[in-house]
């Protein structure tokens, strides 16, 4: 059944926001982002009070709230084509691209440049949503993940996968409208792109090592399946997305420049 508009924040019980525990880490991450990718600070707030309508994953992923968010987003996407049959899979795929696309780059920058590892567990993040239903900004209660601090860049990226990304994919897959593999495919493309963006900062050797571990190893170091495995593949000497993100099925949405269907 296609999503249509409904009251957005009905029956949401707001939880007390976590108190910041490591202001020095917040300052260091903010300074690094400001120096290298200042525009990221437009949609990630570190140890700043979150607005009351910002939600943790546990809150926005509840069936009523998520259905309302997707309904509002559907109304926005189909606003100029009201008679067109609505498709939920490409809609959720694009919604997830917004969510993960705004979340992952600053977290990669934090995890791969700081001595202390940022705790990326979902309870430390509040998402503020745009009036169109997609995410607009993340408010982060900055804490150190003492277990991840001594880890290598590869292990830190695996922490990002297991703690920050898996819960998001599982929440969206629970709608029954999308296969998580599509979201992981989009996410692999994003991470590969941002590794290229970070090459000057991290060095080519580190970036290539991370690419191999993230995209060409079938399992993570803990033995679990690697959801990013072969989400990008080598074609004509370049790593490219393996599957289409499906946005071409939505009205008035710009197609990817390197769409696999071309």
From Swiss-Prot:
Pfam families referenced in this protein's UniProt entry, alphabetically: FhuF, FhuF_C
Source organism, top-level taxon: Bacteria
Keywords: 2Fe-2S, Cell inner membrane, Cell membrane, Cytoplasm, Iron, Iron-sulfur, Membrane, Metal-binding, Oxidoreductase
GO molecular function: 2 iron, 2 sulfur cluster binding; ferric-chelate reductase activity; metal ion binding; oxidoreductase activity, acting on metal ions
Membrane topology category: Peripheral membrane protein
Cofactor: [2Fe-2S] cluster
Binding annotation for [2Fe-2S] cluster: 244-245, 256, 259
Regulation affecting activity: Displays pH dependent redox properties. SufD is necessary for the stability of FhuF.
Observed effect of gene inactivation: Removal of iron from coprogen, ferrichrome and ferrioxamine B is significantly lower in mutants compared to the corresponding parental strains.
Induction behaviour: Induced 2.4-fold by hydroxyurea.
Cofactor note: Binds 1 [2Fe-2S] cluster.
Main location: cytoplasm
BP terms from Gene Ontology: reductive iron assimilation; siderophore-dependent iron import into cell
Result of altering residue 245 to S: Loss of activity. Affects [2Fe-2S] cluster binding
Compartments it resides in: Cytoplasm; Cell inner membrane
Impact when changing residue 256 to S: Loss of activity. Affects [2Fe-2S] cluster binding
Domain notes: Globular monomeric protein mainly composed by alpha-helices sheltering internal cavities in a fold resembling the 'palm' domain found in siderophore biosynthetic enzymes.
Subunit structure: Monomer.
Role description: Siderophore-iron reductase which is involved in iron removal from the hydroxamate-type siderophores coprogen, ferrichrome and ferrioxamine B after their transport into the cell. Binds both the iron-loaded and the apo forms of ferrichrome.
Name under which the protein is recorded: Ferric siderophore reductase
Gene, per the UniProt record: fhuF
